[in-house]
């Protein structure tokens, strides 16, 4: 599965709407970088965040997740409490081709400050805004900036189409917009 280049990413974004909105160069001055890179795309985070809090002394259970465990924040930045996390969404909407799977890795500017992101793979024919988990591994509050880079998407193309894509199996996060909490199929 070779990683795809900037030329391929640009063509797929402009001709097939793979990334919208699409920035065809890397923006770096005065911000956490975002936009097209040599072999990836640095996606941005919106100004909508859900910051984890344990106000109700809830158990964190992915099968019975209590949405009251989060505080909704809309701002130009968010400060994540020490040893806690927040959920956010990508500014970009992605449409992944059937022969492609994507891995998202964190930005070094954040990682060097103890801020780690986690995103599950973007599967073939998945589309939507990416829900991003942002962990503050430090004993101090950590700041995340809206409308700036949060993670790099790497596009890996297979030599043949998959038998069953995310769209084929009607994945539970297909077409998601906003910050989507855990879902369990009934």
Curated annotation (Swiss-Prot):
Q: Which reactions fall under this protein's catalytic activity?
A: dCTP + H2O + H(+) = dUTP + NH4(+)
EC assignment: the record states: 3.5.4.13
Q: In which pathway does it act?
A: Pyrimidine metabolism; dUMP biosynthesis; dUMP from dCTP (dUTP route): step 1/2
Active site positions, chain numbering = 133
What are the GO BP annotations of this UniProt entry? dUMP biosynthetic process; dUTP biosynthetic process; nucleobase-containing small molecule interconversion
Subunit details for this protein? Homotrimer.
Q: What does this protein do?
A: Catalyzes the deamination of dCTP to dUTP.
Identify this protein by name.
dCTP deaminase
Q: What species is given as this protein's source?
A: Chloroflexus aggregans (strain MD-66 / DSM 9485)
């Amino acid at each position: 599965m070779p990683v795809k280049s900037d030329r391929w990413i640009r063509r797929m974004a402009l001709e097939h709407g793979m990334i919208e909105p699409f920035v065809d160069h890397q923006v770096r001055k005065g911000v956490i970088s975002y936009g097209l890179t040599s072999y990836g795309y640095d996606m941005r985070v919106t100004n909508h965040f859900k910051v984890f809090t344990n106000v109700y002394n809830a158990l964190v259970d992915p099968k019975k997740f209590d949405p009251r465990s989060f505080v909704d924040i809309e701002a130009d930045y968010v400060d994540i409490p020490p040893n806690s996390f927040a959920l956010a969404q990508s500014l970009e909407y992605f449409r992944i081709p059937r022969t492609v799977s994507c891995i998202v890795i964190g930005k070094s500017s954040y990682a060097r400050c103890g801020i780690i992101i986690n995103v599950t793979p973007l599967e073939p024919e998945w589309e939507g805004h990416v829900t991003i988990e942002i962990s503050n591994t430090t004993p101090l509050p950590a700041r995340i900036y809206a409308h700036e880079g949060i993670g790099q998407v790497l596009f890996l193309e297979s030599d043949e189409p998959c038998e069953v894509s995310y769209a084929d199996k009607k994945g539970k996060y297909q077409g998601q917009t906003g910050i989507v909490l855990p879902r369990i199929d009934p």
